[in-house]
Amino acid sequence: MERPLTVLQVSLYHPTQGPVAFAKVPLQLQHDASRLLVGRGQDTHLQLQLPQLSRHHLCLEPYLEKGSNLLAFCLKVLTRQSCVWVNGLPLRYLEQVPLHSVNRISFSGIQMLIRKEGGASLEAFVCYFHLSPSPLIYRPKAQETDE
């Protein structure tokens, strides 16, 4: 009997380069339990068309947490050139952070929202990609006061 796959629902947004930056993004990508590379390189699993991205900018690494039978994921930064923000936390080269069920990620003008839906398979996972016409991450603006 086939086990249901862990699903990553990935929404993508770029304020000016959306259709161009995401031209090579598939609607669906099934991947084995190895790391999923993101960047502009031809050998990445999620290829984004932005010149300021590194060939290997970041990766999603699946792993099994102790005492769990579900895949968990961490995001690891592979670029030396810039910072990647994950849920408000800035990450630099080779830093990594575990992902939660909902994650807000920004890098090089790209906004990415990843929602994780657990599945029983430990051998593979599937990503569904959605292009958003509007921003995914909102930062409150500082309010001016008369004080």
From Swiss-Prot:
<dbReference type="GO" id="GO:1905747">
    <property type="term" value="P:negative regulation of saliva secretion"/>
</dbReference>
<dbReference type="GO" id="GO:0043123">
    <property type="term" value="P:positive regulation of canonical NF-kappaB signal transduction"/>
</dbReference>
<dbReference type="GO" id="GO:0007356">
    <property type="term" value="P:thorax and anterior abdomen determination"/>
</dbReference>
<dbReference type="GO" id="GO:1905748">
    <property type="term" value="P:hard palate morphogenesis"/>
</dbReference>
<dbReference type="GO" id="GO:1901078">
    <property type="term" value="P:negative regulation of relaxation of muscle"/>
</dbReference>
<dbReference type="GO" id="GO:0021650">
    <property type="term" value="P:vestibulocochlear nerve formation"/>
</dbReference>
<dbReference type="GO" id="GO:0090103">
    <property type="term" value="P:cochlea morphogenesis"/>
</dbReference>
<dbReference type="GO" id="GO:0030432">
    <property type="term" value="P:peristalsis"/>
</dbReference>
<dbReference type="GO" id="GO:0048839">
    <property type="term" value="P:inner ear development"/>
</dbReference>
<dbReference type="GO" id="GO:0035800">
    <property type="term" value="F:deubiquitinase activator activity"/>
</dbReference>
<comment type="subunit">
    <text>Interacts with TIFA.</text>
</comment>
<dbReference type="InterPro" id="IPR000253">
    <property type="entry name" value="FHA_dom"/>
</dbReference>
<dbReference type="GO" id="GO:0030099">
    <property type="term" value="P:myeloid cell differentiation"/>
</dbReference>
<protein>
    <recommendedName>
        <fullName>TRAF-interacting protein with FHA domain-containing protein B</fullName>
    </recommendedName>
</protein>
<dbReference type="InterPro" id="IPR008984">
    <property type="entry name" value="SMAD_FHA_dom_sf"/>
</dbReference>
<dbReference type="GO" id="GO:0002244">
    <property type="term" value="P:hematopoietic progenitor cell differentiation"/>
</dbReference>
<dbReference type="GO" id="GO:0002224">
    <property type="term" value="P:toll-like receptor signaling pathway"/>
</dbReference>
<dbReference type="GO" id="GO:1902238">
    <property type="term" value="P:regulation of intrinsic apoptotic signaling pathway in response to osmotic stress by p53 class mediator"/>
</dbReference>
<dbReference type="GO" id="GO:0042472">
    <property type="term" value="P:inner ear morphogenesis"/>
</dbReference>
<dbReference type="GO" id="GO:0090102">
    <property type="term" value="P:cochlea development"/>
</dbReference>
<dbReference type="GO" id="GO:0048634">
    <property type="term" value="P:regulation of muscle organ development"/>
</dbReference>
<dbReference type="InterPro" id="IPR033621">
    <property type="entry name" value="TIFA"/>
</dbReference>
<dbReference type="GO" id="GO:0021559">
    <property type="term" value="P:trigeminal nerve development"/>
</dbReference>
<dbReference type="GO" id="GO:0097094">
    <property type="term" value="P:craniofacial suture morphogenesis"/>
</dbReference>
<dbReference type="GO" id="GO:0031223">
    <property type="term" value="P:auditory behavior"/>
</dbReference>
<dbReference type="GO" id="GO:0050885">
    <property type="term" value="P:neuromuscular process controlling balance"/>
</dbReference>
<dbReference type="Pfam" id="PF00498">
    <property type="entry name" value="FHA"/>
</dbReference>
<dbReference type="GO" id="GO:0035112">
    <property type="term" value="P:genitalia morphogenesis"/>
</dbReference>
<dbReference type="GO" id="GO:0048806">
    <property type="term" value="P:genitalia development"/>
</dbReference>
<dbReference type="GO" id="GO:0098583">
    <property type="term" value="P:learned vocalization behavior"/>
</dbReference>
<feature type="domain" description="FHA">
    <location>
        <begin position="36"/>
        <end position="108"/>
    </location>
</feature>
<comment type="function">
    <text>Inhibits TIFA-mediated TRAF6 activation possibly by inducing a conformational change in TIFA.</text>
</comment>
<dbReference type="GO" id="GO:0010468">
    <property type="term" value="P:regulation of gene expression"/>
</dbReference>
<dbReference type="GO" id="GO:0071626">
    <property type="term" value="P:mastication"/>
</dbReference>
<dbReference type="GO" id="GO:0031663">
    <property type="term" value="P:lipopolysaccharide-mediated signaling pathway"/>
</dbReference>
